[in-house]
Amino acid sequence: MGSDDQSAGDRIQKGFQINYMILRDADSGKIIWQENKDFSAPDQEHEARVPVKILDMRAVSREINFSTIESMENFRLDQKVLFKGRIMEEWFFEMGFVGANTTNTWQSTIEAAPESQMMPAKVLNGNVTIQTSFYDNETLITKSVVRLYYI
């Protein structure tokens, strides 16, 4: 990554903020968890306390509301789910163009792994982190790490 890419990433990151995140049961639309917190701060591990029933759902709808000062040509994210530091799952999401000085809501659906691959909540609790890297094309904007606790 060249210095122009780095300065573009820094510029975008300074004006980028997550306003809230919502997880819903994708089938019923019912809110399971909501947090009005900026999970985009890169130099800290965030925590989320999520109801254990989320593990029994066929699919979860994730809604991210974010604001940006800078425009982005191809906003996308790479999300890794890690168990004790080892990658269990990885997803790639692409939103596309995002205008300058806007607030946007991005909703995507994540389907559950087959039941045979699921681990119980007591094993997962506190051992799962979700590492989300936000990009504009290939330029890294910020990386968020959230540790999950099931309640």
UniProtKB/Swiss-Prot annotation:
Cystine pairs: none
Keyword Nucleus: yes
Domain of life: Eukaryota
A UniProt-annotated Pfam family: GMP_PDE_delta
Subcellular location: Nucleus; Cytoplasm
SUPFAM superfamilies found in the cross-reference section: E set domains
Gene Ontology annotations of biological process type: sensory perception of light stimulus
Keywords: cGMP, Cytoplasm, Nucleus
Gene Ontology CC annotations of this record: cytoplasm; nucleus
InterPro entries assigned to the protein according to its UniProt record, in alphabetical order: Ig_E-set, PDED_dom, PDED_dom_sf, Rhodop-sen_GMP-Pdiesterase_dsu
Similarity comment: Belongs to the PDE6D/unc-119 family.
PANTHER family assigned: RETINAL ROD RHODOPSIN-SENSITIVE CGMP 3',5'-CYCLIC PHOSPHODIESTERASE DELTA-SUBUNIT, RETINAL ROD RHODOPSIN-SENSITIVE CGMP 3',5'-CYCLIC PHOSPHODIESTERASE SUBUNIT DELTA
Oligomeric and partner information: Interacts with Pde6.
Name used for this protein in its record: Probable cGMP 3',5'-cyclic phosphodiesterase subunit delta
Taxonomic classification: Eukaryota, Metazoa, Ecdysozoa, Arthropoda, Hexapoda
Underlying gene: PrBP
